[in-house]
């Protein structure tokens, strides 16, 4: 009987531990959901620990149990963005022709950026996620590295197929990324509307088509 009682107690303890772990994960997800809503609707300035706590009816102290500061929350949100974008890019590896895949990756990247301008800024422009990495003394930007590796792998395969002869791998990858990022950033920042550009409503699409012509001839 003692053995049975001990076994039941152990099972109950394990069940309680698992339940508490699940509750913690659910509350952490709730905090991030509230933070993302605030960030997208009201901007980084209004995405404060206090406002996040108020929006989910929890104390500020509860939020601090899960996140050390605002920058950690913003870093977690930026990671969510990379999971979303990375998932869309990985699907394209079903495209066997690496050049066609490279072209499709650019379109997916641009579409994601223009459809999610606030998240795009957080992922690629705002300093908060990088400041968090500095705070915890982490040198590598894992999310950026993973995305860059998807691009690098595709460009390597393009080179193996005979494209980009005479070009250096990483500088070329960085050039491709920079050009597409620039298109997204200028459009998101409303820099294309009043710059005396013809057909500004289509300029990103038209510019990307021109970019594809250029890289196809490299």
Stretches with model-predicted labels:
Residues 1-26:
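N-terminal intrinsically disordered/low-complexity leader segments
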Residues 24-35, 52, 77-89, 151:
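Generic hydrophobic, amphipathic alpha-helix propensity
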Residues 30, 38-72, 76:
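Helix-turn-helix
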Residues 90, 135-161, 170-174, 202-213:
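Amphipathic alpha-helical packing segments from all-alpha helical-bundle domains
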Residues 90-118, 172-176:
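Hydrophobic alpha-helical connector segments
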Residues 115-153, 194-201:
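Short secondary-structure transition hinges
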Residues 160-207:
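Hydrophobic/aromatic-rich alpha-helical bundle segments in the mid-to-C-terminal region
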